[in-house]
Amino acid sequence: MKKFMAVYRGEPGKGNAEWNKLSENERKQRMQQGMDAWGAWMQKNFSQIVYPGGPLGKTLQVNREGISNKVNTDCGFVIVEASSHEEAAKLFLNHPHFSIFPGENVEIMECLPVPVRPQ
């Protein structure tokens, strides 16, 4: 089985604008519904989850100029295994990240082996 990293993405303004239009009670209900659905997704796909990952915090960028703050749209990640890239992607169809919560999408990429230096 191949390993894939799925990155949950969300831009601060897009989905959040609609989320913020909800009343406090509606947001609480949606939050509970989303957490329940996410838990059900984790349970359903338990055998394919290699590492559950989690939410991601603020980003720092390091380059030749040093260290600086960086804004990105990465919200969280999970590592799954599947027989193909497409099979891995299918795990995230209608995922609660964007079907209930205000997330934009989930990007799935294969975790490739580290190239080995020829002897």
Regions found by a protein language model. Give the residues of each.
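Conserved, structured core segments of small domains
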Residues: 1-119
